[in-house]
């Protein structure tokens, strides 16, 4: 079974006041993703949270995601998704019972009985466990407890309640801050406070054949190859410009046989940072269609410096 693992789409994202929908970045990414989908033919698409950038998304963001889901449904590819901390779980899961009849499965809020979606391939059943963003108080409430004080114990308690058939292949979707034996994931500038949300050690997922994580924008494994953050498809901060962006492809064969690789997906605008004196910046050769962060290094800032740079770089957006 071939899976596309996505996360942190952040539809409706603004960067320095510019809409990534209006600037074309997110619609362009969807076009390129659909081309890759037609080329590689995944059996299912996983979205591990933060579909939207805000709990109350804009009309444009909702329309964009609606078009995206419609294209995937037309291709009859199952879509399995959870809510992240940026999403409103209730809003994201609106109409979930109707959507599941079209092969779109959404878990918006934590439940005592974790939603499980099962798909078949030539090797048998694959069970997908959908755990949207959780916090201890919510788990205490649904389990009728009051002793779960941190995120790690809350996740362990929730998973202990589930009947997981270990002889079958199991995949979990989670949107949390996951560490590997205390080692934290590599983050970017748009995630400066994410580490304070609460850590979960990756060994809590030991019973799962693949762990599809969201929450961190840099694509990376956490300890094992099969515990992975997909990362955001686009750079959402200039500090993310050198991060690994692409599409995480997972192939499940027989129990215990999992392979993972990254497919490149073109982006509309690259993020570039340049620095120097005004004279040096005006001589810099920069690729067309780029978002440029220009750092002027001189004691006196020239008058109308930003306007001058924008006139010099007419096909680029200067911040």
Question: Predicted regions span which residues?
Answer:
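Short, surface-exposed connector motifs at secondary-structure boundaries
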Residues: 73-81, 288-290
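Short amphipathic alpha-helical segments and helix-helix/interface helices
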Residues: 66-70, 96, 159-160, 201-205, ...
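Accessory, non-catalytic peripheral segments of nucleic-acid enzymes
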Residues: 39, 44, 252-319
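His/Asp/Glu-rich metal-coordinating catalytic cores
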Residues: 57, 74, 83, 87-223
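N-terminal active-site segment of His-dependent metallophosphoesterases
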Residues: 1-70, 74, 172
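Divalent metal-coordination and catalytic microenvironments
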Residues: 8, 50, 65, 84, ...
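A conserved active-site cap/scaffold subdomain adjacent to cofactor or substrate pockets
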Residues: 202, 209-265
């Amino acid at each position: 079974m071939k899976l596309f693992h996505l996360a942190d789409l952040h539809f409706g994202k603004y960067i320095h006041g510019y809409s990534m929908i209006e600037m074309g970045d997110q619609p362009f990414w969807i076009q390129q993703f659909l081309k890759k989908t037609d080329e590689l033919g995944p059996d299912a698409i996983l979205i591990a949270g933060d579909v939207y950038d805000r709990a109350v998304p804009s009309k444009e963001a909702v329309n964009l995601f609606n078009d995206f889901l419609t294209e995937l449904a037309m291709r009859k590819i199952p879509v399995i998704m959870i809510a992240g901390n940026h999403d409103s779980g209730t809003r994201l899961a609106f109409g979930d019972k109707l959507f599941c009849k079209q092969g779109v499965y959404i878990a918006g809020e934590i439940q005592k009985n974790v939603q499980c979606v099962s798909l078949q391939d030539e090797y048998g059943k694959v069970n997908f466990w959908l755990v949207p963003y959780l916090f201890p108080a919510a788990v205490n409430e649904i389990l009728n407890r009051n002793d779960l004080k941190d995120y790690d114990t809350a996740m362990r308690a929730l998973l202990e309640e589930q009947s997981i058939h270990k002889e079958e292949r199991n995949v979990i979707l989670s949107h949390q801050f996951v560490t590997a034996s205390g080692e934290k994931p590599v983050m970017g500038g748009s995630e400066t406070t994410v580490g304070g949300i609460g850590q979960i050690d990756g060994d809590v997922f030991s019973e799962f054949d693949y762990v599809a994580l969201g929450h961190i924008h840099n694509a990376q494994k956490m300890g094992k190859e099969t515990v992975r953050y997909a990362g955001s498809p686009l750079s959402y901060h200039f500090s993310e410009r050198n991060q690994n962006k692409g599409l995480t492809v997972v192939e499940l064969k027989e129990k215990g046989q999992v392979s993972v690789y990254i497919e490149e997906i073109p982006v509309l605008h690259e993020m570039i940072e340049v620095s120097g004196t005004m004279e040096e910046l005006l001589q810099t050769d920069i690729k067309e269609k780029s978002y440029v962060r220009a750092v002027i290094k001189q004691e006196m800032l020239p008058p109308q410096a930003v306007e001058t740079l924008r006139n010099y770089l007419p096909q680029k957006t200067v911040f």
